[in-house]
């Protein structure tokens, strides 16, 4: 009862717009979770080679990357409520169309459409949360946000995998069962626009009056040059991380089914468990950040994930692969809300939309470029060495990104500390 009361009390303390956004995002991410686990299995069930999955991931990621910056520029000037609502509706409709597409051209075109529309939520979520919270709450709210995203994806991925297996056991063909579940996922994402209709339009003006104006009266404006310097640093780090992720993350379900021949339910449950562990690590992330500093916390989480990443790539034992996958998933992703908080704190309000869009663009470009590389390595070296090589390449890229992140942002933090001490 005490835990339930604490959760209820914490929920009520959130602003109205934050609660509505969290509800909408939960529906949206349930649909995304279903697609993340089942869609490349659907492509495989249609009889396409693994290279087709690589193509789909690449074109979708590239489409998303291409519109990140335009949406970021629009988001700094337009209604976040309108853009989020459009994103939910169009993403849901594109998902529903993808559930029944089977021809190569249809698969590619709808992948492009889904990639374009998915950018709305990815770009606008962080600026929306930032404008509806004060600085002291941001790290906590970002942790809640990323944890809620993963919790909803747990429901989507685990529920989708189990439902697909149940439909097959009831006599439905594999392709039809996957189509049914994918359509349900699209409908869930579509319904996300309903809570967004009740978001108050005056939220942005309210925050500007209460927080930005007093700060402007007491602090000099951040020079645009400093903003763009910070944005470029964040973008470079995310490009390297995205390149590494693009070799492994989109194909984790295929990794388990190809190497260990496990069922759809097992894959869905395993990926869901990884997300549950990530939720826990994200919630304890702010505590670590308060103790060692946010930059060091990001680097520690990322570096601790590397041994588990390599063990996953090289093991032939399903039990070991499952355990190492869970720890890698939790540790690597635990840094995400901390990184968002660092970026929001180091970039002024006027450029947060473009900052988030540029870092997201860099990350998705990494995914887009690595799809064909992963497919080639898997085709050329088989399901053991192909995955071993891609996991190893990802490890090298993660080490590079972590080292770069530490030295770039450690210098800025040290300079700020010296300035504060001098005062």
Model feature map: region roles:
Residues 1-15, 201-237, 422-423:
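Juxtamembrane intracellular "pre-TM" segments in multi-pass secondary transporters
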Residues 3-66, 230-271:
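Helix-loop boundary and gating motifs at the non-cytosolic
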Residues 26, 94, 105-121, 239, ...:
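Hydrophobic core of transmembrane alpha-helices in multi-pass small-molecule transporters
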Residues 67-79, 164, 281-293, 378-379:
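Helix-to-loop junctions at the C-terminal end of transmembrane segments
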Residues 82-97, 296-311:
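Structural signature of the two symmetry-related core transmembrane helices
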Residues 110-149:
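Cytoplasmic helix-loop-helix junction between adjacent transmembrane helices
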Residues 165-187, 376-398:
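A membrane-interface helix-boundary motif in multi-pass transporters
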Residues 188-203, 306, 392-423:
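Multi-pass alpha-helical transporter architecture, strongest
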């Amino acid at each position: 009862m005490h835990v339930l009361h604490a959760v209820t009390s914490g929920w009520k303390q959130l602003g109205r717009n934050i609660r509505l956004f969290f509800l909408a995002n939960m529906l949206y991410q349930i649909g995304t979770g279903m697609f993340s686990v089942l869609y490349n299995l659907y492509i495989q069930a249609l009889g396409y080679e693994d290279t087709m999955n690589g193509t789909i991931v690449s074109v979708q990621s590239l489409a998303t990357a291409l519109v990140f910056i335009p949406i970021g520029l629009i988001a700094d000037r337009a209604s976040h409520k309108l853009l989020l609502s459009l994103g939910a509706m169009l993403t849901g409709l594109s998902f529903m169309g993808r559930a029944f597409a089977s021809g190569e051209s249809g698969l590619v075109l709808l992948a492009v459409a889904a990639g374009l529309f998915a950018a709305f939520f990815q770009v606008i979520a962080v600026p929306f949360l930032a404008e509806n919270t004060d600085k002291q709450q941001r790290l906590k709210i970002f942790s809640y946000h990323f944890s809620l995203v993963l919790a909803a994806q747990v429901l989507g991925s685990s529920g989708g995998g189990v439902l697909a297996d149940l439909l097959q056991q009831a006599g439905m063909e594999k392709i039809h069962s996957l189509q049914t579940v994918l359509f349900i996922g699209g409908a869930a994402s579509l319904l996300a626009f309903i809570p967004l209709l009740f978001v108050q339009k005056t939220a942005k003006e309210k925050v500007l009056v209460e927080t930005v104006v007093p700060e402007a009266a007491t602090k000099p404006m951040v020079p645009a040059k400093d903003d763009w310097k910070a944005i470029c640093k964040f973008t470079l780090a995310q490009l390297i991380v995205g390149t590494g992720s693009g070799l492994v993350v989109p194909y984790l379900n295929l990794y388990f089914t190809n190497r260990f021949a496990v069922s759809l339910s097992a894959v869905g449950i395993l990926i869901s468990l990884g997300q549950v562990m990530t939720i826990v690590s994200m919630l304890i992330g702010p505590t670590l950040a308060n103790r060692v500093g946010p930059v060091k916390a990001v680097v520690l989480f990322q570096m601790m994930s590397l041994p588990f990443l390599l063990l996953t790539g090289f093991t032939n034992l399903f039990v070991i692969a499952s355990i190492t996958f869970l720890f890698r998933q939790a540790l690597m992703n635990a840094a995400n809300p901390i990184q968002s908080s660092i970026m929001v704190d180091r970039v002024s309000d006027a450029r947060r939309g473009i900052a988030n869009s540029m870092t997201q663009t860099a990350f998705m470009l990494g995914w887009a470029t690595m799809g064909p590389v992963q497919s080639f390595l898997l085709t050329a070296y088989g399901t053991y060495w192909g995955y071993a090589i891609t996991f190893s390449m990802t490890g090298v890229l993660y080490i590079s990104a972590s080292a770069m992140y530490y030295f770039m942002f450690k210098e800025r933090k040290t300079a700020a500390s010296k300035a504060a001490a001098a005062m």
